[in-house]
Amino acid sequence: MSRRISLREFQENLARRLAEAKTGERRGLLGIQAGSENWLLDLAETGEILTPPALAAVPLTRDWYRGLANVRGTLYGVVDFSRFHHGAPTPAVGSARLLLIGARLGVHSALLVTRVLGLRSREDFEPDSGLADERPWVRERVRDMQDHPWLRLDTSRLLAHSAFLDAGTD
C-alpha cells in the first residue's frame, strides 16, 4: 500500500527535484533497511545490488556471517547486516537484497539487507540532536522530513573494524 502524501508535499518534492535536475545535483545516498534500522550509504562506497544468490555456508563462523556468494566468478563474504547488529536474521527471500561493498578498498564483501529503500539526497535529512551512536562505523545520525531516524554508514570503518573482520567463532 502506498503512502498518501498531501498535494503540498507532492509539489514541494516536485519543485526540489526540478531544481536538482537544473543544477545537476545528484542523489548521492542509497537508503537501505537492515532489520528495524534505516541506513544511508554514500553511492561512491557501494557496488551492485543483487537478488541474493545461493550462498555457500562456511563452518565455524558467527551467526551473522551467512557464507560466500559467487558473483560472476568472484567470491564475496556475505554478512547479515541486521544480525550483525544483534537484530533478527534476514531471510534471503522476497525484498531482501545483497549489497556489494568494499570494491574500492579491495575487499569483496556483501551486506544482506532487508530491503533497498532507494536513492536519497543529503538535503532530505537533518542532523539528529539525540544521543550519539556508539558504533564506530556510524558516521552520523540523521532524521528525514517525516522525523524517521536514519544512520549514515561509514563503510571503510565498518570493513576495517575488528568486530566485522572476526567472523570466526571462538
Where are these regions (language model features)?
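An acidic, low-aromatic, low-complexity terminal/linker signal
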Residues: 1-170
